[in-house]
Design a protein with these regions (language model features):
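Sequence-structural signature of mature extracellular/luminal beta-sheet repeat domains
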Residues: 17-338
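Sec-dependent signal peptide recognition
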Residues: 2-10
Length: 338
């Protein structure tokens, strides 16, 4: 009987066995007393699922009481619950053809979806690398199918996007998003690339696309402050690893920009790069970076790090903001917050 249970658990490594005590990884590094007010000093970084290829875009679905996330190379979404662990959620999340695509360069083909978000109407919105668009899943959240409505697939110049990476909604219904070339088969040198830059964009409710910035080499994670007055964007570039802050007018248009924090000198010291980020209700920023997840105050002061050991790509809060979920390469992690 014990052998049978062990064999079953081995088959379900990627999902985890319900009721198990999770393995832990990493540590917490506090640089400021405020860090301990946000992350409990005795919190553990739990590995709640593992065995993936390269995961991204964690998103909690309140109506389904589950976390969904992208496993980019296999072109699919998974969902995680405490009861079931990780199970399949959606096939063909970023590309409707076969993967890997012919001629891709790099360690693996990034044709799948990346960032995930909920529309104001509680529909799943996907940043689709392979299809080079941002799309809305037209089927219900409790009956997911690869059936999509394109929200935007061409920029302000009528050119195809590179591979939309991440996005966030403004209270007025407009959508901010980033467009680096990671999802193109040939990367930045892909022969089908139509722009020679990586953009930060705004899609208004009426469908108008506005270019916010074309000067970032690899714009990536993106999030809004609680008061909607500041847009934060991570730039995942080895020689210009920064977070930008864009000051917004009431209508969501940009009136100014500045570098919030530069961590270029930290690149290579630990696994990671400025990538996905989220902001809590008090304006504190939980941003993936060298070493794991950095916690920053609204002015960019580094308060402490949730050290993940693996390359952290993105984060998501539980509905009550008391739990932080972290996608870290092949691992799905969880840490309790205060």
């Amino acid at each position: 009987m014990k052998r049978t249970i062990r064999a079953l658990c081995a088959l379900l490594t990627i999902a985890g066995c319900s009721g198990e005590t999770y393995k832990t990884i990493g540590s917490l590094e506090s640089l400021d007393p405020q860090f301990g007010k946000l992350v409990s000093p005795d919190a553990k970084i739990e590995i709640i699922a593992e065995g993936f290829s390269w995961i991204e875009g964690p998103l909690w679905l309140p109506t389904e009481d589950c976390l969904v996330f992208s496993n980019i190379p296999p072109n699919k979404l998974w969902k995680w619950t405490e009861k079931e662990g990780a199970v399949d959620y959606l096939e063909k999340s970023g590309f409707l053809g076969k993967v890997p695509r012919p001629g891709f360069k790099g360690a693996f083909d990034e044709a799948g979806s990346n960032g995930l978000l909920l529309s104001p109407e509680n529909k799943l919105v996907l940043c689709q690398h392979g299809l080079r668009q941002i799309a809305l899943m037209t089927t219900p959240l409790n009956d997911p199918k690869p059936e999509y409505k394109t929200l935007t697939d061409r920029n302000h110049e009528g050119k195809k996007y590179n591979s939309p990476n991440d996005g966030c909604y403004h209270k007025d219904g407009s959508l901010f998003f980033t467009d680096p070339p990671y999802g193109l088969p040939g990367g930045a040198d892909d022969e089908t690339r139509e722009t020679d830059y990586s953009g930060v964009y705004r899609l208004s409710k009426d469908g108008k696309v506005t270019l916010i910035d074309d000067q970032l080499e690899r714009p990536n994670g993106i999030a809004l402050s609680p008061d909607q007055k500041t847009l934060y964007v991570a730039n995942s570039h080895g020689t210009n690893a920064i977070w930008m802050a864009y000051d917004l007018n009431e209508d969501g248009t940009v009136k100014g920009k500045r570098v919030l924090k530069d961590v270029t000198k930290r690149v290579g010291t630990r696994k990671g790069m400025p990538d996905g980020l989220k902001i809590n209700d008090e304006g504190y920023i939980f941003a993936t970076a060298p070493g794991g997840v950095w916690v920053l105050d609204p002015e960019g002061k580094h308060l402490g790090t949730i050290v993940t050991k693996e390359f952290a790509s993105n984060v998501a809060f539980s509905p009550d903001k008391k739990t932080l979920y972290i996608t870290a390469d092949m691992l799905l992690l969880r840490v309790k917050l205060r």
